[in-house]
Amino acid sequence: QVYANPIAYSTDQHGRTYVNSKSGFLISVQPSRSTSRGSVNIQSPNVKVSPLINANSLNTKDDQLMAIKAGRMIQQIANTKAIKSVTKKAFDVNFMNLDDEGLLNSFREFASTVYHPCCTCRMGRSINNSVINNKLQIHGLKNIRVVDASSFPNITSGNINAPTMMLAYRAAEIILEDNF
């Protein structure tokens, strides 16, 4: 998924992203079918202690090749007459002259999740490879269900808003069937 934002972002010394006060835009790519898998682990019985989250981005060769291909595509778009006519200079990193390794390093440094996490409580048949069953119940428990994008067994090819609404609609039907 390629998108352009009419705003520019920068990253501070602590790795936090902020909106740059200067006029700018962003051309970006969001791979829709990542093959890398991360993890979310509980590190304490204390609910106030955050879980350990490892996105594990760009861990597979397929994802690395996709990032390089995406970087090359962004370079081609940025090199068009139309984009060049409205561009003075790059804010943080000039992607135009990066080789494959440079593109990967840049993606590792600046990439983010775009706030659409899913598949962390995966639906499946077995407790060995999933958290919930096909009725959205946590394996081994009857009255607790997971009804959000975390229950998807696989990430969708695009934004997850509509599939999440469809899941919620189906979950309501399942809950009514089970209780009436």
Regions found by a protein language model. Name each.
Residues 1-163, 171-180:
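FAD-dependent oxidoreductase catalytic-site/capping-region signature
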